[in-house]
């Protein structure tokens, strides 16, 4: 696991985009994408770029259960507004949160992932250490599944809704086992509220109580953090290859 420290989220997006360009130059064709505030600066770099993504396939991590794609709180809507409308892909896959049989939808999504192995997976991390919507206690062997969201996740996501009561209580999420099959993982985290989760992910025991800790076992993970999110990584009793990067403006 390589840790790259950056000045702020904007610089973090630039670094992530540089990593993507390197991956594309090596033949990457399928991107695993995330939502939320952490990857927005990365998507902004993609949108500003002259690169053409029309030969790429994207597979998103998750979607709320019960929201139409036209809802401005759906992740389908988020992706269109932040990336896909400006930069069309060959094919974009997201779980169908309105599927009549959501268990069958989860199985269908696993088949999509199997047919399109992910070359470059973007992740955020929740305050409780979740990746995707894989909450604490999720089996590391889990593939795409229906999730009952924890109160801490509902509260954290309520800032995107009119009220906390409007936040969906379930989601369909790519599982940890599926995420771990990705060839390369880039995790972005910004802000003091992520510091505990980052410390646990990097230095803590590998435990289902902190889902992101499983990333210690992946061969190619790059973590991009600002100083606040990295604030608990400095310790005289812990050793880690921390890279401080300064981008040219």
Swiss-Prot record:
Paired cysteines (S-S): none
Gene name per UniProt: nagB
Species for this entry: Streptococcus pyogenes serotype M5 (strain Manfredo)
Gene Ontology MF term list: glucosamine-6-phosphate deaminase activity; identical protein binding
PANTHER family with a match to the protein in the record: GLUCOSAMINE-6-PHOSPHATE ISOMERASE (PTHR11280:SF5)
Keyword Zinc recorded: no
Protein name: Glucosamine-6-phosphate deaminase
Catalytic residues in the record: 62 (proton acceptor), 128 (for ring-opening step), 130 (proton acceptor), 135 (for ring-opening step)
Residues spanning the signal sequence: none
InterPro entries in UniProt: Glc/Gal-6P_isomerase (IPR006148), Glucosamine6P_isomerase (IPR004547), Glucosamine6P_isomerase_CS (IPR018321), NagB/RpiA_transferase-like (IPR037171)
Enzyme Commission code: 3.5.99.6
Protein function: Catalyzes the reversible isomerization-deamination of glucosamine 6-phosphate (GlcN6P) to form fructose 6-phosphate (Fru6P) and ammonium ion.
Enzyme class: hydrolase
Gene Ontology CC, one term: cytoplasm
CDD domains listed in its UniProt record: GlcN6P_deaminase
Family: Belongs to the glucosamine/galactosamine-6-phosphate isomerase family. NagB subfamily.
Pathway involvement of the protein, from the record: Amino-sugar metabolism; N-acetylneuraminate degradation; D-fructose 6-phosphate from N-acetylneuraminate: step 5/5
Protein keywords: Carbohydrate metabolism, Hydrolase
Keyword Protein biosynthesis: no
């Amino acid at each position: 696991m390589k840790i790259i420290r950056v000045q702020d989220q904007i610089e973090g997006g630039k670094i992530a985009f540089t990593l993507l360009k390197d991956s594309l130059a090596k033949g990457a064709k399928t991107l695993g994408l995330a939502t939320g505030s952490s990857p927005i600066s990365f998507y902004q770099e993609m949108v500003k770029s002259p690169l053409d993504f029309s030969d790429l396939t994207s597979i998103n991590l998750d979607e709320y259960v019960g929201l139409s794609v036209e809802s401005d709180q759906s992740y389908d809507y988020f992706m269109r507004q932040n990336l896909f409308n400006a930069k069309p892909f060959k094919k974009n896959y997201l779980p169908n949160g309105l599927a009549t049989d959501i268990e069958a939808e989860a199985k269908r999504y696993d088949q999509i992932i199997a047919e399109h192995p992910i070359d470059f997976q973007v992740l955020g991390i929740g305050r409780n250490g979740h990746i995707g919507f894989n909450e604490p206690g999720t089996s590391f062997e889990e593939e795409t599944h229906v999730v009952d969201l924890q109160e801490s996740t509902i509260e954290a996501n309520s800032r995107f809704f009119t009220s906390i009561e409007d936040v969906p209580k379930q989601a369909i999420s790519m599982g940890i086992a599926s995420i771990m099959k990705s060839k390369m993982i880039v995790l972005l985290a910004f802000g003091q509220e992520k510091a505990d989760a980052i410390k646990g992910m990097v230095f803590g025991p590998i435990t289902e109580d902190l889902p992101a800790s499983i990333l210690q076992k992946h061969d190619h993970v790059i973590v991009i953090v600002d100083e606040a999110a990295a604030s608990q990584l400095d310790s005289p009793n812990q050793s880690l290859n921390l890279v401080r990067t300064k981008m040219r403006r």
